[in-house]
UniProtKB/Swiss-Prot annotation:
SUPFAM superfamilies: Serpins (SSF56574). Belongs to the serpin family. May act as an inhibitor for a host chymotrypsin-like protease. This is Uncharacterized serpin-like protein R700. InterPro entries: Serpin_dom, Serpin_fam, Serpin_sf, Serpin_sf_1, Serpin_sf_2. The record marks M363, A364 as: Reactive bond. It comes from the Viruses. One of its GO terms (molecular function) is serine-type endopeptidase inhibitor activity. Keywords: Protease inhibitor, Serine protease inhibitor. It comes from Acanthamoeba polyphaga mimivirus (APMV).
Length: 401
């Protein structure tokens, strides 16, 4: 089989859905629903709860991940789930994703500054469930190959897909040793985001500044004075920085107290906030003039996500004796979920990417006049990239310096 030719053929067919984005570098929005915008509130609530639960189940600090990439991958699995697995995923996600929901999210997540892509590689020993293939039409590249003789080529092509779809921000996410004789499919999701700030930071303003944590560090601190959506209470400050496409913002939640011994803090040295609390902070933002200090940074993290999801209560999907995923004629269970995310913040804007690799195995407000606020992110903080019309979190992390 000429795998490379077939891969390119399917990829070209898939990428043709977004060909206007690449034509002469003209920023054209594909399928952006702007009038009469609506999305089931339960989807946003599900995404926000999932974001919160994942973030506070990490055992390490300085995390960055994409709730959207993970959620979309689990939603694609839900489409193929039999009764018991479907019930398990619905309970875990807090929502039963339909094909219409997935198509809707796929459309709004593909824009002039963002793209979401999917690839499904299936072991050619098994036939693909035709109903599932039909559901993924227009959403994913689907190929079949020999998982025994072509392991090296498959891992190479998966890595090429991820590298291409993330603008080379993520490379070599899997190798041929990740594919064994029991592997029956590899599902790949990527998300890529690149946008300039509406209010850029003057490069000449960037200076070395101390960043407070257990050990004092020095970071490149960007600086500007401008008007932003801003909120504060006795415990924290929140600011949202708009991009040129104001459907997207980066938010920073900055605790006012940053003593690492503070009992109210998690292992991440940041306070615990529920999705409802974060939404309340956002809803109470006011347009205010702010003296703003934000570190210039790059953050990257890779995870094996099965242990994290098990810790959160999702177990049925990984049960090799009892999972009913109908991606192929043969039932399969999930053996690994690899997730990698990277975010780059500088004076011009933000570039971010994430990928989720699922490996399946066969079974045995108004402007107000106020004095200038000072927002100095010189200690640990939570940050996120959010799609404003839906309220969906695309990336979520904590910066520790």
């Amino acid at each position: 089989m000429d795998y490379s030719h077939k891969y390119i053929k399917y990829k070209k067919k898939y990428l043709s859905l977004r060909n206007k984005l690449d034509r002469e570098n003209t920023p054209v929005i594909i399928s952006r629903i702007e009038d009469n915008f609506s999305i089931d509130d339960k989807i946003t609530q599900s995404n926000n709860n999932f974001t919160n639960n994942v973030f506070y189940n990490f055992d390490t600090s300085a995390n960055i991940f994409s709730p959207m990439s993970l959620t979309f991958s689990l939603a694609l699995l839900q489409l193929a789930a039999g009764s018991e697995t479907d019930k398990s995923l619905t309970k875990f996600l807090g929502y039963k994703y339909s094909l219409d929901d997935i198509n809707y999210l796929f459309n709004i997540m593909n824009s002039s500054i963002m793209k979401l892509s999917n690839l499904l590689v299936v072991n050619n020993k098994y036939s693909i469930n035709q109903e599932y293939r039909s559901m993924l039409n227009g959403i994913a590249v689907i190929v079949q190959d020999d998982f025994i003789t072509n392991k090296k080529l498959i891992s190479q092509k998966v890595n090429e897909f991820v590298e291409s779809e993330t603008n080379a921000m993520i490379k070599n996410v899997i190798n041929d040793s990740d594919i064994d004789n029991k592997s029956v499919f590899i599902m790949v999701n990527t998300i890529y985001f690149k946008a300039n700030w509406k209010h850029k930071f003057p490069v000449d303003n960037t200076t070395k500044m101390r960043f407070h944590r257990t050990q004092e560090d020095v970071v490149d601190m960007m600086y500007q004075v401008n008007s932003f959506n801003y909120y504060e209470n006795k415990a924290l400050q929140l600011i949202e920085l708009p991009y040129n496409d104001e459907d997207y913002v980066m938010g920073i939640i900055l605790p006012k107290v940053y003593n690492t011994d503070n009992v109210d803090y998690t292992i991440n040295n940041v306070p615990m906030f529920s999705p409802a609390e974060i939404n309340e902070f956002i809803n109470n933002c006011q347009y205010s003039k702010v003296e703003l200090y934000v570190p210039k940074f790059t953050q990257r993290k890779r995870y094996e996500f099965v242990p994290i999801l098990k810790k959160m209560g999702l177990t049925h999907l990984f049960n090799k004796n009892d999972t009913d995923l109908n991606i192929m004629a043969k039932d399969a269970y999930i053996s690994r979920i690899i997730h990698e995310a990277v975010v780059v913040i500088d004076e011009i804007g933000t570039e971010a990417a994430a990928t989720t690799i699922v490996i399946g195995q066969a079974m045995a407000t108004r402007p107000v006049k106020q004095k200038i606020k000072v927002f100095k992110a010189d200690h640990a903080f939570i940050y996120y990239i959010r799609h404003q019309p839906t309220g969906l979190f695309l990336f979520f992390g904590d910066y520790q310096g």
